[in-house]
Curated annotation (Swiss-Prot):
Disulfide bridge partners, by residue number: none
Family: Belongs to the adenoviridae packaging protein 1 family.
Function: Component of the packaging machinery which encapsidates the viral DNA into preformed capsids and transcriptional activator of the viral major late promoter (MLP). Binds, along with packaging proteins 2 and 3, to the specific packaging sequence on the left end of viral genomic DNA and displays ATPase activity thereby providing the power stroke of the packaging machinery. The activity of packaging protein IVa2 is stimulated by protein 33K which acts as a terminase. May be the protein that pumps DNA into the capsid powered by ATP hydrolysis.
Residues annotated to bind ATP: G171, P172, T173, G174, C175, G176, K177, S178
Compartments where located: Virion; Host nucleus, Host nucleoplasm; Host nucleus, Host nucleolus
Source domain of life: Viruses
Keywords: Activator, ATP-binding, DNA-binding, Host nucleus, Nucleotide-binding, Phosphoprotein, Transcription, Transcription regulation, Viral genome packaging, Viral release from host cell, Virion
Changes seen on gene knockout: Empty capsids are produced in the absence of packaging protein 1.
Primary location class: virion
Protein's UniProt name: Packaging protein 1
Length: 449
């Protein structure tokens, strides 16, 4: 008969287990990861706070460490150092160029690091990370314009897909304006290639025969491009573009304004393909009472609507003065407003160049505007027939200002990137100024009075 309340007999070889405290957990088994040579059979329990009589562990049983900053490895990896080095080379070149300008006295001096090593050592993590992002943005800007350029970095076209092409050529006598006009057509910088070229002068007899032959040869040259295996490929729908010389008085005849008139010589040519109108030595005629501004804004759209084959309309006007006083009919003023391109000879009078640059560089920093004026001054001292071109509606912002060199071709000036780099120089200047101000304040506070 079993006795109530008696504990059952313990099993053989079983040790008595002490009764656990109600507020304590059961004893844990030995940890999994232990050194086998120094494994303790009965490791001591981890020291902890007494849970107290309530049996609940306090909320602050395990003391938490204060938040620690994340461990950082090297401040800059290899790619970041490459970005900073590449950007530093550009910044150093721009800074030296600005300091060497004759007009550098009017610019605010910018503080900068003495060398690349000083920048990498003392720049600080925040500034260096900012420079890395800025150089990545510069690379993106260069990659965006790369499809519009040839392999040598020159522009493949002056207008690309822009239509109509209304351009003004500014230059004094003897600067090569006539040669520039022929080169634009022969080098296929105007697209599409015109099939008919109208050369308009005050009088037909004043055009020398040698110049007429040069026009005929160069527009024929511009109609072909080299092909494979020594072949040539026509660039238009004709094998020989037409060259038509006209007097200015024939241009302003009434029937030449009406595209539906069968006597309109421009409509007849537009029915066959693209056309180009060249006005040379006509500045005095344009300043007269007869208005011809229709050729700059209304006439192109009418030709495009009526003649689908006329896929290109180009008007290039030569002016000897950037601001002529005589403009009774407003032709020159309307021409400047409608013009998409301004081709400027660096040999123009400096006062006229400065006025033009001040007008069309409102969005650029003052330093870049002065740099552009210095570029004009530099090319004016050379004997080459260089031209600087301003495009009001460029295919890309980097192509807004270009220069045309007889050997290098049409090269973009990248003034947008130069402006971006100048803003980076200003950022470095502000950072160094802040550090100097903080250092002065710290020394003033620590210096005993």
């Amino acid at each position: 008969m079993e006795t109530r309340g008696r504990r059952p007999a313990a099993l053989q070889h079983q040790q008595d287990q002490p009764q656990a405290h109600p507020g304590q957990r059961a004893a844990r088994s030995a940890p999994l990861h232990r050194d086998p040579d120094y494994a303790d059979e009965d490791p001591a329990p981890v020291e902890r706070h007494d849970p107290g009589p309530s049996g609940r562990a306090p909320t602050t049983a395990v003391q938490r460490k204060p938040p620690q900053p994340a461990k950082r490895g090297d401040m800059l990896d290899r790619d970041a150092v490459e970005h900073v080095t590449e950007l530093w080379d550009r910044l150093e070149l721009l800074g030296q160029t600005l300091k060497s300008m004759p007009t550098a006295d009017g610019l605010k001096p910018l503080k900068n690091f003495a060398s690349l090593q000083e920048l990498l050592s003392l720049g600080g993590e925040r500034l260096l990370a900012h420079l890395v992002r800025e150089n990545m943005q510069v690379r993106d800007m260069l990659n965006e314009v790369a499809p519009l350029l040839r392999d040598d970095g020159s522009c493949s076209s002056l207008n690309y897909q822009l239509q109509p092409v209304i351009g003004v050529i500014y230059g004094p006598t003897g600067c090569g304006k006539s040669q520039l006009l022929r080169n634009l057509l022969s080098s296929q910088l105007i697209s599409p290639t015109p099939e008919t070229v109208f050369f308009i002068a005050p009088q037909v007899d004043m055009i020398p025969p040698s110049e007429l032959k040069a026009w005929e040869m160069q527009i024929c040259e511009g109609n072909y491009a080299p092909g494979p295996d020594g072949t040539i490929i026509p660039q238009s729908g004709t094998l020989r573009p037409r060259f038509v010389k006209m007097a200015y008085d024939d241009l302003i005849l009434e029937h030449n304004y009406d595209v539906s008139d069968p006597r309109n010589i421009f409509a007849q040519a537009a029915a066959r393909g693209p056309i180009a109108i060249i006005m040379d030595e006509c500045m005095e005629n344009l300043g007269g009472h007869k208005g011809v501004s229709k050729f700059f804004h209304a006439f192109p759209s009418k030709l495009h609507d009526k003649f689908p084959k006329c896929t290109g309309y180009t008007v290039l006007v030569v002016l000897h003065n950037m601001n002529p006083r005589r403009d009774m009919a407003g032709n020159i003023a309307n021409l400047k407003i409608q013009s998409k391109m301004h081709l400027i000879s660096p040999r123009m009078h400096p006062s006229q160049l400065n006025r033009f640059v001040n007008t069309y560089t409102k969005g650029l920093p003052l330093a870049i505007s002065l740099l552009l004026k210095d570029i004009f001054r530099h090319h004016a001292q050379r004997s080459c027939y260089d031209w600087i071109i301003y495009n009001t509606t460029p295919q890309h912002e980097a192509l807004q200002w270009c220069y045309l060199h007889p050997r290098d071709g049409l090269m973009p000036m990248y003034l947008n990137i130069q402006s971006h780099l100048y803003h980076v120089l200003e950022k470095i200047h502000r950072t160094l100024n802040d550090r100097d101000r903080w250092s002065r304040a710290y020394r003033a506070r620590k210096t005993p009075k």
